[in-house]
UniProtKB/Swiss-Prot annotation:
<comment type="subunit">
    <text>Homodimer.</text>
</comment>
<protein>
    <recommendedName>
        <fullName>UPF0764 protein C16orf89 homolog</fullName>
    </recommendedName>
</protein>
<comment type="similarity">
    <text>Belongs to the UPF0764 family.</text>
</comment>
<dbReference type="GO" id="GO:0016020">
    <property type="term" value="C:membrane"/>
</dbReference>
<keyword id="KW-0964">Secreted</keyword>
<dbReference type="InterPro" id="IPR031751">
    <property type="entry name" value="DUF4735"/>
</dbReference>
<feature type="signal peptide">
    <location>
        <begin position="1"/>
        <end position="25"/>
    </location>
</feature>
<dbReference type="GO" id="GO:0005829">
    <property type="term" value="C:cytosol"/>
</dbReference>
<keyword id="KW-0732">Signal</keyword>
<dbReference type="GO" id="GO:0005576">
    <property type="term" value="C:extracellular region"/>
</dbReference>
<dbReference type="Pfam" id="PF15882">
    <property type="entry name" value="DUF4735"/>
</dbReference>
């Protein structure tokens, strides 16, 4: 039985890769089936999932709301797919309420610091699509992370205004600005540089680069930084997909798709990438990262080992990864909205 279970991802990959001519509705069906399993898992384990995992499901909630709002009513199949999405959204909303209450009780400090992003209305979805630029890829990348999770959290709470009770939002210290605009960062420090600017934009912080006196950066806008980071995250994903699609790198691969997709870079929504992600889901539990020890890939990004279970990673009792499950379902929500927009010629990618 164990051997059959281990062969399932390979079987799925062969089946999916053989369907090169999948229609958008076929792809949407596959995404909805995967999301249904992921939400069923959250129904059962939501109270045990950490903050990062819950944020992933919060983003999925925003994506499902947008999907059901804009779903093309073209035929019976499309209507039945929308009905399935509405049903999942109702289930998810109920489970999220319970999960948020549990987080507030079990992890009050982190809950308070990141409470604003635990509301799906905080997250804005792309209104139009763009593509990354290979010419913006760094000539060299650091071997180690540029900063740790403590620094990342601190800078983001300055933007959110949660660094103290009734704190002023949109504070950008020189240290945070210099850290979050440093070029050549890899992995999680790169994706969190993008997340920093995403949070600032969604919070309404319009002067994030004010005071940057570096002549080499004088013409670089927030939008340009996002394009630089996502262009490098695209290169990272291409390298990962080509060389090392193991449990160790799957998490960062999916996180890059999630974040850059939210910024509006449609070239992250590649069909073969989606097909691979679908094979990584445990078909019985509905989670991601099961039986893969991915916790060690966060070590550089953590300022102390004991924080591993707080936000960045938590391996649940069933062996599933809290972080990877959260980013995977929200990335799949992004794929869903992209393929729905592909049926709407007004939302086709901008060349």
């Amino acid at each position: 039985m164990k051997s059959l279970k281990m062969l399932y991802p390979l079987f799925m990959l062969l089946v999916l890769s053989s369907k090169i001519d999948l229609s958008n509705q076929d792809v949407i069906d596959n995404i909805l089936m995967s999301l249904s399993k992921g939400i069923t898992y959250f129904d059962m384990q939501g109270s045990n999932i950490n903050l990062d995992g819950v944020v992933g499901y919060i983003i999925l909630q925003a994506q499902l709301r947008e999907a059901t709002r804009t779903w093309p009513h073209s035929d019976f199949l499309s209507l039945s797919q929308r009905a399935a999405a509405i049903s999942m959204l109702k289930r998810l909303s109920k489970s999220l309420s319970t999960a948020a209450s549990t987080l507030q009780e079990t992890d009050p400090k982190y809950f308070k610091e990141f409470e604003p992003i635990l509301d799906s209305s905080f997250w804005s979805l792309p209104g139009e699509w763009s593509s990354t630029d290979p010419s913006l890829v760094y000539t060299s990348v650091r071997a180690m992370e540029c900063y740790d999770e403590h620094m990342s959290d601190k800078c983001m709470t300055f933007l959110l205004g949660t660094w103290k009770d009734n704190g002023t939002p949109c504070i950008v210290t020189k240290t945070c600005r210099d850290t979050m605009t440093q070029f050549g960062c890899p992995h999680y420090s790169l994706s969190h540089q993008l997340l920093y600017f995403m949070i600032g934009t969604m919070k309404g912080c319009s002067k994030m680069l004010k005071g940057d006196l570096r002549l080499s950066r004088v013409n670089i806008t927030v939008g340009h930084y996002k394009r630089i980071f996502c262009s490098n995250m695209m290169k990272s994903n291409q390298d990962i997909f080509k060389n090392s699609l193991t449990g160790q790198m799957q998490d960062i691969f999916i996180e890059n798709i999630l974040l850059c997709g939210l910024v509006g870079f449609s070239d992250f929504y590649k069909l073969d990438w989606l097909q691979s992600i679908l094979t990584w889901q445990d078909q019985e539990a509905g989670c991601f990262g099961k039986e893969e020890d991915i916790s060690h890939i966060f070590e550089e990004f953590l300022d102390a080992p004991h924080k591993r279970v707080k936000r960045r990673e938590k391996t649940l009792t069933d062996g599933c990864s809290s972080h990877m499950t959260g980013v995977a379902v929200s990335a799949l929500g992004g794929f869903l909205n992209f393929y729905l927009s592909e049926q709407d010629i007004t939302k086709r990618p901008i060349i």
